[in-house]
Amino acid sequence: MKRSFLLLTCIVTGCLCGCSKLEVQPSESDLVFNDLASVWDEAMPLGNASVGELVWQKGDNLRLSLDRIDLWDMRPIEAFKGEDYTFEWVKNQVRKGDYDPVVDKFEKKAYLAAPSKIPGAALEIDISSWGPVKENRLYLDNALCEVLWENGASMKTFVQADGDVGWMVFENVPESFDIQLVPPEYQVKGAEEAGLGSSSLALLGYPQGEVKREGNRVTYHQQGWKDYFYDVAVDWKRAGGKVIAVWSVTSSISGKKAASEVDKALAEGPKKAYKRHMGYWEPYWEGSSVNVPDATIQHQYDREMYKFGSATRKDSYPISLQSVWTADDGFLPPWKGDYHNDLNTQLSYWPAYIGNHLDEGLGYLNTLWNQVGKYKEFTKKFFGKEGLAAPGYCTLEGDAMSGWVQYGFSPTTSAWLGQHFYLHWKYSADNEFLKERAYPFLRDVALFLEQETEVKPDGTRTFEYSSSPEINDNRIDAFFPVITNYDLALTKFAFTAAAEMADSLGLVDDSARWKKDGGQLPYYAIDEDGGLSIAPGKSYDLSHRHFSHAMAIHPLGLLDIHNGPKEKTIIDATLERLHANGPDWWCGYSYSWLANMEARAAHGEEAAEALRTFAECFVLRNSFHANGDQTKSGKSQFTYRPFTLEGNFAYASGLQEMLLQSQSGVIEVFPAIPKDWKNVSFNRLRAMGAFIVSAELKDGKVVSLNVYSEKGGTLKILSPIDGTVITRQTRPGETVRII
């Protein structure tokens, strides 16, 4: 989508009247409807990684669901205390064949209402007299939602990109206009007797917060667990025939006060706020763009990149399952809105790299780095080892949460987290980051895995028990007595990446150590058809949502078609078996992941088909990934609709992989596009080595190919004309025109 931006041309007539116009730029990928959604998970999403808003209609009211990323109940899990809170105890129960105590401890006793992400509150405006909605549009370029009613009333709302506030500007609304602040119901009489289970907000045990009103100002204070609390405030004024409103959500963690944030915003006025808002979004969209001939794929891609910019920042907490769009239905969010490190957080950041949004990706890496101390404490306590292991399911602050122990407490989780440090280094060529963050993180992961694995008499390094998310669910046989391809690939990656980093830093002894450890690992388990098995003796002979057995192909890239016919055969056979076993028990994110793998295999048609299926079958009308097949057309037997974001962001990565790859050490443009895509272009996608690439395919021929070298160094790029590798030495800041 080609983007252009309009300058803000607001006329100031007093501070509050400075929003006479909030200029917007429509795009073909905007979300446009002639009504308001009637449920929260189909609402228009706005956010800035700190606070978020969902715009929809509940009954006769316009409803804005407000959220904040650090609204959390992080009470400790009592079941995770005691001498039996160790991996050795778990393994001993597996050895004895007595697994019920493990399920009892890590699931039944631990899966309570909290810890969990919690909702904020909602704002409601009575629109019963306003008549039908004429247009409801989310302007992606401007991160602004505009609603027009047939009677002439209108609202523009945006979540300020650089603050903890949201704005609403109404025109042509009645004198009776009012805003109500509606808090979540934390006190529901008879909740336990009603059988609401662990999903009811009432079971958190909070006192119902107090809503106070002084004129047009409404505030809400909610006490959470122990000393935690959060506040919501909204205030509005009439000015120049308009109603201008500001809301804020703050928490005791943030150290800010919602009412003060609202006061500061109103004093500044919407003109300046919107200018700063666009000061983020304009360069964000200029970071990269793609243009493909398939409108379905194009529109979904643009919507994913919009949500990515709304859900993460350099200094933000990472993207959780629902980010700043927590469920507004009176219940806890799906899977408690936590951080799932067995797939979800990792997939959510895939588009940061080729998509040229490394700063947005730093919100993830900075948080992981800041929690290293906590991970090391967990490693020592639970595994009894030095080094670094991280929980598979965790809270905002990195503490372990309940769940299936095979994946929530997997020893290789930290290796997958570590890959993101590796990717940031490779795509940024930032040697300071390598020295100060990336290598120390991977080094500690490798140190832990060196201890957690064992070397058998034949010299082979393995685990006593291994797993592969989420094969065999939470049963005892989900622990394999042989190393799975999932654990093998992650362990192999950790040692290989640590050795490469050590080499780059001139740490000869470290490099030799990690190479030795990696060299003791076996080769991948291969099935009778030549593809990757789940584990030795266990083929991928089922339909499963999590392609954990294929990690070596993508995202780890340990197996690559550029490495010769043997690896190409393994990759092709693995994908063939995935298709042969069918998608009965896939989720939406499975199709997104599949698109990335098909792209790595240079299967353009198959990659595009996976993306198209995701966009047509697994998203709600507002573009949210709903996990299940919403069309019930046989794309999955899962037809439910729990909203999670990882499928959305992995989708964006899938298209990026079709357009640009560099994992082999050689940059290749359009490596995996369908044959009928004759006119394709992209601008400023990022390759490894800190090379920024722009290219255009016209009538089936590459007519433009330019590479900007951020850091200098050796550029290797595959000529789209004759297939030879072009090698150039570049200077920092130099642009190389290939075609």
Spans of model-derived segments:
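Bacterial Sec-dependent N-terminal signal peptides
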Residues: M1-V24
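Catalytic cores of secreted or luminal carbohydrate-active enzymes
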Residues: K108-S128, P642-M688, I692
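Carbohydrate-binding surface patches
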Residues: A161-M168, G689-T714
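Carbohydrate-binding/catalytic loop surfaces
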Residues: Q322-W335, G384-W404, T460-T484, G531-H544, ...
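Active-site core of glycosidic bond-cleaving carbohydrate-active enzymes
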Residues: N341-E377, E397-D399, F409-N431, E436-Y439, ...
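Acidic/histidine-rich catalytic neighborhood
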Residues: D444-M501
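C-terminal beta-sandwich/jelly-roll accessory domains of carbohydrate-active enzymes
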Residues: K701-I739
